[in-house]
Every structure is written in C-alpha cells, then in structure tokens.
C-alpha cells in the first residue's frame, strides 16, 4: 500500500486556494502545505497568515510558499489557478483561457518530476480535468476533478433544510457537468434509509412540485453567491479538502468527483461528475447508478455538452 508523507501543494493562492488550505489545516488533513502562485509575495503572505493559526488546529502543519519544483515529492497537487467566473458568466465561458492556463501549470508541475495525484478545482472543472490529464501523462485514475462534490452538498443542504434533518443523513447525488446541465438523481436519493420519492407528498415540507425547484436552486446557487460577493470559495474549499482527505487516508470513500468514463454509463472518453471510489491510488472504481429514463436523457445531454466544448478546444475544430 502506498504510504504518504501527507505533503500537498496548492497551485493558486486566490480565494479558492487559500480556502482549501484553511480547511485542510483546521481538519489536520496534511502534514505539509506548499502554496504556489505567480505572485510569490501573495503566497508568502498567505503562508504566514495561515501559520499564525496552526497552533489552534488539530495537527502541526508546516505551511510555506514554494514554486513548481517543490511539487516533485508532493503526494497531491491541487490546482485552483485560472480566470474567475464573473457575474452573468457560465463556467463554460471560461474554457478557452483556462485551458491554456491549465496546460502551462501542469507542464510546470510535471517538469519537477511529480508522480502523485492531481486534483483539479479550476472551472470549468470537467473540461479542465481532461486537459490536465492529457497534459500530465498520468494515468486517468490519478487525475481527479472536484466534479459535483459541491453541487451534491448543496443538494443535501436544500433537502435537509426543507425536511429539518441533519444534512449528513441525506444521501443523494448531483451528476454530470459541474454547471448548468447537471442532473439531480432523485431516483437514488435517500433520507436515512427511506427513498425520498416515498416521502414526497406525504408531508407539506416536500411536494412533487418542489423537486424541480430544488434542482434549479442547487444549479443556480453559484450565480446567486457571485451576484452578492463576486466569488464562491468556502464551499469548494471544504469540498476539495474532503477529496484530499479521502486520498491521503486511503478511505475508499464514494465521492461525486469528476472522473474518466471508459464505457461506464454508456459514455467514452470524458471526465464528468459521478460517484467514484477515492483512495490513495486515486479513483479506483466508478459507481454506476441505475438511472431512470429521464435521468439518463439529462445525463446524456450533459455529457454531450461537455464533449462539444472539448471538441471546440481541438486545433482543427
């Protein structure tokens, strides 16, 4: 079994990168955190600020500002760098500029001799995870996007608030694109041990009419946040930290990450958000949900949209 030193590098020290670092320190996930940014003074300042709180955390974490060469012996490199989503802009609108940024970053990481696991948190995450995989030359199992982890926790939050229960007792997934074409899998959503479709219309808290409203609210949460504060970062910070924790601790946890499909769900050669088993080898298995007809159709549309965007990035497209 692979033994980790629990050394993690984070590329990009904007709101998302520092939120990931902050979440990891508070949870004692890593032993060493390296912050890498084109603005070295910024990464140095963030490292100093984060270190000031380490003594109140669960573990003693060494946090410092480095460069790409320091990724050489990292267990995980988390990539957050890229252009930010602006009000009125979809995640897919970012694709051209961020694809080029991603290629440059990954090339710099791989030049260091890095041979660990890449976790991608830049948007549009499904497309950029594919770009990172191609640029890295790593096995598909060791290139993981944050996928629909954030969408899934938003989904569980909405249901928990409506039903007045702990969100940790809501079991359900958002799959597909992390974005406008994402799919809520109602057919496999459980409240405790009870299917949610058996609960619908038995309580005034949740009716059939509420289901599409909830799906849309989950889908549009990012836009709502961006309209109010220009960026989202705490939720994705905690979601990314959860993925890193599963890898470093070899949890074999089922998480809705952006993983490579090679025949699963009837799809080929695409990264998208689906439940997958995550441990110290990266993604070791894809969990295939038995989707109903409507969910299959929506998932197909979501994947098709991602493939169209990928095709637009090809030189001769």
Swiss-Prot record:
Record-stated family: Belongs to the LDH/MDH superfamily. LDH family.
Pathway: Fermentation; pyruvate fermentation to lactate; (S)-lactate from pyruvate: step 1/1
Function: Catalyzes the conversion of lactate to pyruvate.
Keyword Coiled coil: no
Annotated beta-D-fructose 1,6-bisphosphate binding sites: 156, 171
GO process annotations (BP): glycolytic process; lactate metabolic process
Quaternary context: Homotetramer.
Residue numbers binding substrate: 85, 91, 123-126, 151-154, 232
Protein activity control: Allosterically activated by fructose 1,6-bisphosphate (FBP).
Native source species: Enterococcus faecalis (strain ATCC 700802 / V583)
PANTHER family, alphabetized: L-2-HYDROXYCARBOXYLATE DEHYDROGENASE (NAD(P)(+)), L-LACTATE DEHYDROGENASE
Active site residues of this protein: 178 (proton acceptor)
Matching Pfam families: Ldh_1_C, Ldh_1_N
CDD domains: HicDH_like
Keyword RNA-binding: no
Gene Ontology molecular functions: L-lactate dehydrogenase activity
Gene3D superfamilies: Lactate dehydrogenase/glycoside hydrolase, family 4, C-terminal, NAD(P)-binding Rossmann-like Domain
Annotated catalysed reactions: (S)-lactate + NAD(+) = pyruvate + NADH + H(+)
InterPro entries on file: L-lactate/malate_DH (IPR001557), L-lactate_DH (IPR011304), L-lactate_DH_AS (IPR018177), Lactate/malate_DH_C (IPR022383), Lactate/malate_DH_N (IPR001236), Lactate_DH/Glyco_Ohase_4_C (IPR015955), NAD(P)-bd_dom_sf (IPR036291)
Gene: ldh2
Protein name: L-lactate dehydrogenase 2
Binding-site positions, NAD(+): 16, 37, 42, 68, 82-83, 104, 121-123, 146
Primary enzyme class: oxidoreductase
């Amino acid at each position: 079994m692979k033994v980790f030193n629990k050394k993690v590098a984070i590329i990009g020290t904007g709101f998302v990168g520092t939120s990931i670092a902050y979440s990891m320190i508070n949870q004692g996930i890593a032993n060493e955190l390296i912050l890498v940014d084109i603005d070295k003074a910024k990464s140095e300042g963030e490292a100093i600020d984060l270190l000031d709180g380490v003594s109140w955390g669960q573990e003693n974490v060494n946090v410092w500002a480095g460069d790409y060469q320091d990724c050489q012996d990292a267990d995980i490199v988390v990539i957050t760098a890229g252009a930010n989503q602006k009000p009125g802009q979809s995640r897919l609108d970012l694709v051209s500029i961020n694809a080029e940024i991603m290629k440059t970053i990954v090339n710099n990481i791989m030049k260091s001799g890095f041979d660990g696991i890449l976790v991608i948190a830049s948007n549009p995450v499904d497309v950029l995870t594919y770009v990172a995989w191609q640029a890295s030359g790593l096995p598909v199992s060791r290139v993981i996007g944050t996928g629909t982890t954030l969408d899934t926790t938003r989904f569980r939050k909405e249901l928990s608030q409506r039903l007045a229960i702990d969100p940790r007792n809501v079991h359900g997934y958002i799959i597909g694109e992390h974005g406008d074409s994402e799919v809520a899998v109602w057919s496999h959503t459980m409240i405790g041990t009870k299917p949610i479709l058996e609960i619908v219309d038995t309580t005034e808290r949740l009716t059939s009419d509420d289901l599409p409203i909830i799906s849309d609210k989950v889908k549009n949460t990012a836009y709502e946040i961006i309209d109010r504060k220009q960026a989202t970062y705490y939720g994705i910070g905690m979601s990314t930290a959860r993925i890193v924790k599963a890898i470093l601790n070899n949890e074999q946890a089922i998480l809705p990450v952006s993983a490579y499909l090679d025949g699963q769900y009837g799809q080929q050669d695409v990264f998208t958000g689906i439940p997958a088993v995550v441990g110290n080898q990266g993604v070791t298995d894809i969990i295939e949900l038995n989707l109903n007809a409507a969910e299959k159709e929506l998932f197909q549309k979501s994947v098709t949209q991602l493939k169209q965007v990928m095709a637009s990035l090809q030189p001769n497209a």
